[in-house]
Amino acid sequence: MMRCVVYSIAKSSPLELVKIYQKQCKQFDCELELVDLFPKNTANAQKVSKELAQKSYSLAFEPYLNPKAKNIALHPKAQRGDSFAFSKMLENHLNINFFIAGAYGFEENFLKGCQAWSLSEMTFSHEVAKIVLCEQIYRALSIIFKHPYHK
């Protein structure tokens, strides 16, 4: 069974659409899970400085970096591609972790432990980014398994 986990610095997860994609991914034997992390120190760090905020995100995410998994950090200045390129990146991996930072983005050191990927040149709210990411995971699985969803 494949497992994709989306970790984000957020207080709560969206949304009915995410639940639909979670259900649809199961047909490809893929568990799609969302984990929202918002440690107490993050709110304070975000008020103090960008650097402290980024450090708090790294500290929240580091326990979930798995050397046996494909770790992907969503980053606006990273490589991007179409749905086929995204599916190629996911193909042949059983455990995939996605990381969505808070408003100040990632520390460079955290990015060294991940492959960085951008969903778009545009900036999205966390809620929209999660929906787009979940849909693209489902679309990638559809491409990999030659399901008619992706036409």
From Swiss-Prot:
Q: Where in the cell is it found?
A: Cytoplasm
Q: Which Pfam families match?
A: SPOUT_MTase
At the top of the EC hierarchy, this enzyme's class is transferase
Q: Which UniProt keywords apply?
A: Cytoplasm, Methyltransferase, rRNA processing, S-adenosyl-L-methionine, Transferase
Is S-adenosyl-L-methionine tagged as a keyword? yes
Q: Where does S-adenosyl-L-methionine bind?
A: 101, 119-124
Q: What is its main location?
A: cytoplasm
Specify the superkingdom: Bacteria
Q: Which InterPro entries match?
A: Alpha/beta_knot_MTases (IPR029028), RlmH-like (IPR003742), tRNA_m1G_MTases_N (IPR029026)
Q: What is its EC number?
A: 2.1.1.177
The answer on whether this UniProt entry bears the keyword Transferase reads yes
Matching Gene3D superfamilies, A to Z?
A: 3.40.1280.10
- What is a single molecular function from GO for this protein? rRNA (pseudouridine-N3-)-methyltransferase activity
Its GO CC terms are: cytoplasm
Reactions accelerated catalytically: pseudouridine(1915) in 23S rRNA + S-adenosyl-L-methionine = N(3)-methylpseudouridine(1915) in 23S rRNA + S-adenosyl-L-homocysteine + H(+)
What quaternary structure, including any partners, is listed in this protein's UniProt entry? Homodimer.
Briefly, what is this protein's role? Specifically methylates the pseudouridine at position 1915 (m3Psi1915) in 23S rRNA.
| Family of this protein | Belongs to the RNA methyltransferase RlmH family.
What name does the UniProt record give this protein?
Ribosomal RNA large subunit methyltransferase H
Q: Which organism is it from?
A: Helicobacter pylori (strain G27)
List the lineage, top down: Bacteria, Pseudomonadati, Campylobacterota, Epsilonproteobacteria, Campylobacterales
